UniProtKB/Swiss-Prot annotation:
Family: Belongs to the universal ribosomal protein uL5 family.
Subunit structure of this chain's protein: Part of the 50S ribosomal subunit; part of the 5S rRNA/L5/L18/L25 subcomplex. Contacts the 5S rRNA and the P site tRNA. Forms a bridge to the 30S subunit in the 70S ribosome.
Gene name of the encoded protein: rplE
Keyword Ribosomal protein tagged: yes
Entry keyword set: Ribonucleoprotein, Ribosomal protein, RNA-binding, rRNA-binding, tRNA-binding
Pfam families the UniProt entry points to: Ribosomal_L5, Ribosomal_L5_C
GO cellular component: ribonucleoprotein complex; ribosome
MF annotations from Gene Ontology: rRNA binding; structural constituent of ribosome; tRNA binding
Free-text function comment from the UniProt entry: This is one of the proteins that bind and probably mediate the attachment of the 5S RNA into the large ribosomal subunit, where it forms part of the central protuberance. In the 70S ribosome it contacts protein S13 of the 30S subunit (bridge B1b), connecting the 2 subunits; this bridge is implicated in subunit movement. Contacts the P site tRNA; the 5S rRNA and some of its associated proteins might help stabilize positioning of ribosome-bound tRNAs.
Species of origin: Geobacillus sp. (strain WCH70)
Protein name: Large ribosomal subunit protein uL5
Origin organism lineage: Bacteria, Bacillati, Bacillota, Bacilli, Bacillales
Length: 179
């Protein structure tokens, strides 16, 4: 069993039960899924850029991403509906915990001038969004093979009803929030 999942079951669940006075163990918030999204704006002019983004996302997440396409045509961006403009991957279960563990313990500390992640990035429904400026913080990415520094969005979807519950859940799991 994954290290983070074990921690969730043994330490986090009892702590949340006592703090928020839940009646049943099923009320305790848990992480439902993690969605990693990489928008590749230059895929319009350079379709090869998307291939490398998909490859990198596969390495980071450990599963094949879905290519996202434009919903509408936007003339200003020379964009037609249906053109591929990004990639996203949804992690659940074992892989989700593996990724979160890796993110918290290895990748985030490698960010330059890292002082913790923002406390304000909750959406009011108990989900947390985190933007990453460069894919090089992940240990699987080889610095020499990167042709362009790309960022990504990581959305952590929890079953928490409020931001406060979600923040407590992530803090107990070891998410380094700013002081």
């Amino acid at each position: 069993m994954n290290r983070l999942k074990e921690k969730y079951l043994k330490e986090v669940t009892p702590a949340l039960m006592s703090k928020f006075n839940y009646k049943s163990i099923m009320q305790v918030p848990k992480i439902e899924k993690i969605v990693i999204n990489m928008g590749v704006g230059d895929a319009v002019q350079n379709p090869k850029a998307l291939d490398s983004a998909v490859e990198e996302l596969t390495l980071i997440a450990g599963q094949k991403p879905v290519v996202t396409r434009a919903k509408k045509s936007i003339a200003g961006f020379r964009l037609r509906a249906g053109m591929p403009i990004g990639a996203k991957v949804t992690l659940r279960g074992e892989r989700m915990y593996d990724f979160l563990d890796k993110l918290i313990s290895v990748s985030l500390p490698r960010v330059r001038d890292f002082r913790g992640v923002s406390k304000k990035s909750f959406d009011g429904r108990g989900n947390y969004t985190l933007g990453i400026k460069e894919q090089l913080i992940f240990p699987e990415i080889d610095y020499d093979k990167v042709n362009k520094v790309r960022g990504m969005d990581i959305v952590i979807v929890t079953t928490a009803k409020t931001d406060e519950e979600a923040r407590e859940l992530l803090t107990l799991l070891g998410m380094p929030f700013q002081k």
